[in-house]
């Protein structure tokens, strides 16, 4: 009986490891929202880390989070390191490319609770009187991440946060005088 149980456990472990081994080497999470405003309105909110408190889904998770800013006030070279509780961890963002009212690319380095280095891109596409804002995150999937993804995907982990952030971004960009 014990030998049979051990064999079942080994088969399950090997199965999970096998599934992890065939997971993709990279991940992509993407969400979008239509904003009833010209592209410059949402662009101003994502291109300036000082304004992320108006819409970022993670800002409210730790009111005592330590934030700082370095480099230019906005655009390419703007840097935003943070350190907070276990819900937000610690890390650093840097705008690596900013194309006015069309695109913002950010290098996102997580330091805690796990290390990860990803790229986040906000693309703003005019659609008549509105703007489609697309939020995309891509990054590598080391084996530990692949193992985790057997049970829960990156999309399931952070997709809901992207959706919540885009709802807040939409509201902030559509606010009169934004």
Segments from the language model and where they lie:
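Hydrophobic ligand-binding cavity/cleft-lining segments
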Residues: 4-67, 72-73
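Beta-strand/loop substructures that line and gate deep hydrophobic ligand-binding cavities in soluble
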Residues: 96-97, 107-163, 169-171
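Extracytoplasmic/secreted envelope proteins and their assembly/folding machinery
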Residues: 39, 43-52, 77, 92, ...
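Short, surface-exposed coil-to-beta transition loops
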Residues: 28-30, 88-93, 115-121
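Extracytoplasmic/periplasmic/luminal assembly and interaction segments
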Residues: 49-99, 147-148
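A generic structural micro-feature
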Residues: 23-25, 72, 85-87, 112-116, ...
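Short, highly charged C-terminal tails/helix-capping segments
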Residues: 67, 170-178
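Generic structural detector for well-ordered beta-strands
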Residues: 32-36, 81-83, 94, 105-107, ...
């Amino acid at each position: 009986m014990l030998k049979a149980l051990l064999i079942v456990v080994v088969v399950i472990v090997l199965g999970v490891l096998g599934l992890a081994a065939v997971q993709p080497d990279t991940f992509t999470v993407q969400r979008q929202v239509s904003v009833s405003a010209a592209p410059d309105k949402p662009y101003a909110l994502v291109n300036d880390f000082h304004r992320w408190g108006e819409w970022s889904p993670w800002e409210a998770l730790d009111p005592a989070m330590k934030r700082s800013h370095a480099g230019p006030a906005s655009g390419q070279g703007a840097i935003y390191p943070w350190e907070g509780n276990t819900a937000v961890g610690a890390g650093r963002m840097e705008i690596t490319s900013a194309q006015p009212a069309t695109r913002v690319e950010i290098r996102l380095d997580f330091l805690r609770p796990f290390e990860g280095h990803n790229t986040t891109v906000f693309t703003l596409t005019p659609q008549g009187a509105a703007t489609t804002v697309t939020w995309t995150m891509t990054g590598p999937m080391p084996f530990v991440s692949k193992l985790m993804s057997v049970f829960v995907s990156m999309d399931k982990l952070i997709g809901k946060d992207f959706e919540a952030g885009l709802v807040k971004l939409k509201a902030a960009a559509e606010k009169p005088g934004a």
